[in-house]
Amino acid sequence: MGVHLEVFRLSTHWFLAITALVTNGLQYEAIRMISPKMLPAISAYAVSGLYLFQFNGMRQAMAISIFVFGVALILRGHRFGWVFLLTAALIHSSTLIVLPAFILSRRFQQRNTFNIRIVLLSGGVFLALLLISTALATFLTDLVGDKYGSYLDQNMGSGRGRLIHLALMLMVVWFLQSTELPNQLRCATRFYSLGLGAQVVGLQLAVLDRVTLYFVASLPMFICFLLAHGSRARHIVLWLGIITYFFISLTHYGDLIPYEWTLS
């Protein structure tokens, strides 16, 4: 980020302000393009962890917002949305891990989600291979760069906040399976369901846990449909889960990525 400050000759305050405007502005536009109701969508964005993350991971937060904006364009039928996805990859290399998942989510168009058990099992198998396979760890290091890849050699958990988030994602995917959705939106919900696998990996490797945020970014797009179906009790449980995770993020952010298990 220091390079950008020198190139554009911006003060730190102005640079932070412009970055925040771009990050949140693109997220807002993506939500506006897809969600028929803004209040629940913006509320979900504010308390799902995405908003707080940008205070700690500014560059990746911008990449996520560009990625989500591109996804929204693609869902609206605009092929040049792929340009934004590639741009996001240029800004932060973690996007390269997520791109194949989005491409996969464009298949099986009649399904709201992928099979939960298969996704969880795939995440567990990938984590096991990553922990025992030097070749796979080396490949990911080359993909995301030495700055982040060096963390793959370390056995780092992501705290109890990640367990709560995994439970929240499981609940959302379970609710999605019984929710009527527009055909164009099913790609986003299938993509979100693949985030379960990323979160399983993130339970043990904090650096890959941040990849989960790309999947979480699609939640504001479809949350109003979750709230339009099911009982009031289901809606209350959903919001309680989201708000609980938000307060853990807000009051004890260090417990989300302390590089050790806090349950022990």
Residue ranges and their predicted role:
Residues 17, 28-48:
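Transmembrane-helix signature of polytopic, membrane-embedded enzymes
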Residues 74, 89-92, 201:
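Transmembrane helix irregularities
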Residues 55-61:
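Short acidic/glycine- and proline-prone juxtamembrane loop motifs at membrane-interface regions
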Residues 67-80:
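Membrane-interface transmembrane helices that cradle and orient dolichyl/undecaprenyl
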Residues 81-84, 94-105:
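Transmembrane-embedded, aromatic-rich helix segments that form part
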Residues 99-216, 252-264:
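Alpha-helical transmembrane segments and terminal signal-anchor/GPI-anchor hydrophobic tails
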